[in-house]
């Protein structure tokens, strides 16, 4: 038989090798060709003057918004001190040299060959697509994006300095920095990778059992203890009267194994990342019970981050990484790019999923597994802002469910790890009248408002918890 065909062997595929000569299937070949064409189109779009201007403004606006969560505060500050003084004040509080360094200047890079880890899920879209679209190389970086099997491995490789930066679950840098589950190692969240983009998926056998009050005894999967998935699932169950520690079982399952566990009947459902919610529908083993945006619209999920040591030793390299990932997020936010992005990130070296599955997730036009086609444009989005109030909420849930014991300095931890600095201190230094209290935005989860200035009061409102 030739190296391409083996038509009379029952134990081998008919077509052994692609006609291009490479050792992959024709289907993989077509996916790669489509991905290359889509990447070329997106690269061309990224090089237009229109996108260059949009991207630059997006990055700078993101940085300024980090310091001024409230629009009126930003306007008052600028009117009071003027543009130049404001830029100087802002520059002094950013985590790298200056606003211009973050937004446009390219200082000498301390390190150019970098290894960045990722889990193959759509949450990592900005980090992944920056590679084939050339956003890293445009910043002078030679980046290897490395597919990783699970979150514990991501944690260990960051602690052991095998990765320079990584795709994190957004609560992970908090947990790692505090020494929860591993030796304490200071980590930072540079940007949120995605908002929304998760779902509660149930086995098809439960399609007539949609009321969570009836789920006592269910077995659920989540990707990691320190994940928004775990915290949101626990929140949802508790709001419906179930104790997540005694009335159900919650198991840690790597995202790539969730659909197989659902198919095998090992779990009744999971709150997990896409594309695996949509893949369960695609494989006809599950249905989408609820998008997490319906629990908390705009909630964070994953983050892009690195160690505090890396930032301190490589400030210009970190700034270059920051620019590359924010440029990618700017492109991912534009709905007109989503179908092309699905082609770029679906092949084997990235997500290894059917393009149709990824496209449904990113465009928000999807089959729900119950016979309906849904149209939810903001099913997944890419807002990079690491609000410190998000970190405070995560810390409240860690305390609520017994992951943290004793007193918690919420504000100090949030401001140390999530790289946004409150502008109020610098307004005061400039002689401006400053309202009392931290300038964190408020959030609404299942109809209940969360005020990051009052975390302990918030915790006292919950009847179901694991606090002493």
What is the predicted function of each stretch?
Residues 81-89:
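Sec-dependent signal peptide hydrophobic core
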Residues 163-165, 254-286, 307, 339, ...:
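Ligand-binding pocket segment of bilobal, Venus flytrap-like solute-binding proteins
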Residues 395-468:
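Conserved C-terminal helix/tail region of periplasmic/extracytoplasmic solute-binding proteins
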Residues 1-79, 91-100:
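N-terminal secretory signal peptides
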Residues 200-201, 303-306, 310-311:
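Short glycine- and hydrophobic/aromatic-rich loop-to-beta-strand nucleating segment
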Residues 314-419:
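Secondary-structure end/capping motifs
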Residues 104-252, 261-278, 284-298, 439, ...:
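Short, glycine-/small- and polar/acidic-enriched structural segments
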Residues 162, 167-170, 177, 204, ...:
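Sec/Tat-exported extracytoplasmic proteins
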């Amino acid at each position: 038989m030739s190296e391409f065909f083996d038509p009379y062997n029952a134990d081998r595929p008919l077509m052994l090798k692609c006609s291009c000569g490479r050792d992959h299937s024709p289907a993989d070949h077509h996916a790669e060709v489509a991905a290359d064409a889509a990447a070329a189109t997106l690269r061309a779009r990224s090089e237009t003057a229109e996108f260059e201007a949009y991207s630059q403004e997006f990055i700078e606006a993101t940085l300024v918004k980090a310091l001024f969560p409230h629009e009126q505060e930003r306007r008052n500050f600028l009117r009071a001190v003027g543009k130049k003084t404001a830029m100087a004040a802002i520059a002094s509080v950013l985590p790298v040299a200056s606003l211009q360094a973050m937004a446009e200047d390219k200082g000498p890079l301390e390190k150019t060959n970098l290894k960045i880890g990722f889990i193959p899920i759509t949450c990592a879209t900005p980090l992944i697509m920056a590679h084939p679209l050339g956003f890293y190389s445009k910043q002078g970086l030679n980046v290897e994006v490395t597919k990783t099997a699970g979150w514990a491995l991501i944690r260990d490789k960051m602690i052991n300095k095998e990765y320079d930066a990584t795709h994190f679950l957004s609560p992970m840098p908090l947990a790692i920095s505090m020494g929860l589950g591993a030796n304490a190692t200071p980590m930072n969240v540079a940007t949120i990778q995605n908002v929304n983009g998760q779902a509660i998926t149930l086995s098809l056998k439960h399609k007539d059992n949609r009321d969570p009050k009836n789920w006592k005894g269910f077995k659920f999967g989540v990707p990691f203890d320190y994940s928004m998935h775990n915290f949101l699932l626990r929140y949802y169950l508790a709001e419906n009267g179930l104790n997540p520690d005694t009335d159900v079982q919650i198991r840690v399952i790597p995202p790539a194994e969730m659909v197989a566990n659902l198919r095998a009947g090992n779990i009744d459902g999971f709150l997990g990342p896409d594309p695996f919610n949509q893949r369960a529908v695609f494989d006809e083993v599950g249905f989408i019970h609820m998008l997490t945006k319906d629990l908390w619209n705009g909630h964070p999920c994953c983050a892009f981050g690195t160690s505090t040591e890396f930032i301190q030793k490589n400030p210009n390299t970190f700034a270059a990484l920051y620019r590359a990932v924010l440029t990618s997020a700017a492109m991912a936010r534009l709905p007109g790019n989503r179908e092309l992005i699905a082609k770029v990130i679906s092949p084997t070296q990235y997500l290894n999923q059917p393009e149709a599955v990824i496209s449904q997730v990113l465009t928000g036009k999807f089959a729900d597994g119950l016979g309906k086609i849904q149209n939810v444009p903001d099913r997944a989005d890419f807002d990079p802002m690491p609000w410190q109030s998000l970190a405070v909420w995560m810390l409240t849930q860690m305390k609520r469910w017994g992951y943290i014991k004793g007193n918690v300095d919420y504000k100090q931890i949030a401001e140390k790890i999530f790289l946004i600095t409150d502008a109020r201190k610098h307004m005061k230094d400039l002689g401006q009248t400053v309202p009392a209290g931290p300038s964190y935005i408020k959030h609404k989860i299942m109809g209940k408002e969360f005020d990051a200035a009052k975390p302990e009061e918030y915790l006292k409102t919950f009847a179901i918890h694991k606090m002493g």
